[in-house]
Amino acid sequence: MEKKLSSENNQLSSENILGLLPHRYPFALVDKVIENIPGERAVAVKNVTINEPQFQGHFPERPLMPGVLIVESMAQVGGIIVTQMQNLPKGLFVFAGINNVKFRKPVVPGDQLIISCDLLSIKRQRFGKVKGEAHVDGKLVCSGELMFSLVD
């Protein structure tokens, strides 16, 4: 599948994202990219809806988006940055670690996560690190550093 950007502000549609990332329902956690500087930075949207499967058990009486899924959403935005880097080998980059992750506010159905990631480093064309932040209504809800590794 060819990787095409929409013409407006280098945005990526959900179809573009599916062409870049291997994730599929129910684990595709990025709805669209609203700012995209390939290999450097991406800002994306994740709309949190009550019909997502995790809310059946987390928690039925008071649904909260699990923190691990917020972090995974940030990792997927980081993956969008890495997969567009022309000088890296093609292959599957996987989540390899997290540092300094903090959860500051709960995320609930109806919220819209605005996730920004900035590339911090690439080493030996196999390992990457991004800084990620997730905001709801302009308030920081999660932040941290995420590491990626190319698997053979």
Swiss-Prot record:
It comes from the Bacteria. The active site is at 58. It catalyses: a (3R)-hydroxyacyl-[ACP] = a (2E)-enoyl-[ACP] + H2O. The keyword Cytoplasm applies. Its EC number is 4.2.1.59. Its main location: cytoplasm. It is an enzyme of class 4 (lyase). It is found in: Cytoplasm. Pfam families: FabA. GO terms for molecular function: (3R)-hydroxyacyl-[acyl-carrier-protein] dehydratase activity. CDD domains: FabZ. Keywords: Cytoplasm, Lipid A biosynthesis, Lipid biosynthesis, Lipid metabolism, Lyase. GO terms for cellular component: cytoplasm; membrane. One of its GO terms (biological process) is fatty acid biosynthetic process. Belongs to the thioester dehydratase family. FabZ subfamily. Involved in unsaturated fatty acids biosynthesis. Catalyzes the dehydration of short chain beta-hydroxyacyl-ACPs and long chain saturated and unsaturated beta-hydroxyacyl-ACPs. NCBIfam families: fabZ, PRK00006.1. HAMAP family: FabZ. PANTHER family: 3-HYDROXYACYL-[ACYL-CARRIER-PROTEIN] DEHYDRATASE. This is 3-hydroxyacyl-[acyl-carrier-protein] dehydratase FabZ. The gene is fabZ.
